[in-house]
């Protein structure tokens, strides 16, 4: 990371896993990573992410060969595998994609940051979310309410079973909230809540 600072690099996409999602040792490593990035004035997307894509700019930095056409639907997924499945479905069905982000562990850039970006992005006309947890519930729901007044926000919440909760923790390094409470709050914020992945698109 200090070498990146010398090259004046401001952003880093970190696909690598082995950080907060694996436990205490990984959390310490992630905290050290974040501190090094802050010292170098660098923003990290990830770690433990499948990457990003922006078909409008032919930017495909993700662990998949899918190439959906440009469009107006933006996808952010805390599960990289599900995110890639959604991209594959979009490509197969001819659904245009504005952008995709696999948010990973959200060590620096969080789902709340994404939501605030969607609010001012005119190319995004529909927001699709797969969430396992949020770090700042108040900020998330406030931004979702603002975005929802301008464009639909569609969400699938992971962790519907005990096994799902464990899987969510392994993906994001955070515990999933009680799903009924979370979904009720989401509906109050104007989010369209669905129960199956393919209902997102």
Q: What are the roles of these predicted feature ranges?
A:
Residues 1-201:
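Catalytic-core regions of core metabolic enzymes
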């Amino acid at each position: 990371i200090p070498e990146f600072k010398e090259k004046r690099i401001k952003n880093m996409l970190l696909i690598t896993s082995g950080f907060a999602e694996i436990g205490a040792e990984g959390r310490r490593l992630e905290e050290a990573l974040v501190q090094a990035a802050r010292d170098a004035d660098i923003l990290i997307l990830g770690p433990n992410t499948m990457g990003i894509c922006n078909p409008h700019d032919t930017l495909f930095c993700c662990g998949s060969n899918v190439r959906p056409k440009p469009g107006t639907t933006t996808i952010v997924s805390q599960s990289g595998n599900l995110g890639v499945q959604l991209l594959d479905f979009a490509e197969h069905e001819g659904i245009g994609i504005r952008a995709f982000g696999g948010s990973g562990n959200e060590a620096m850039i969080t789902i709340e940051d994404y939501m605030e970006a969607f609010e001012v992005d005119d190319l995004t006309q529909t927001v699709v979310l797969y969430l396992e947890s949020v770090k700042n519930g108040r900020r998330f729901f406030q931004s979702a309410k603002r975005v929802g007044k301008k464009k639909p926000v569609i969400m699938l919440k992971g962790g519907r079973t005990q096994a799902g909760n464990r899987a969510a923790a392994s993906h994001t390094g955070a515990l999933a909230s009680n799903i009924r409470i979370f979904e009720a709050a989401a509906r109050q914020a104007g989010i369209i809540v669905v129960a199956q992945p393919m209902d997102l698109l």
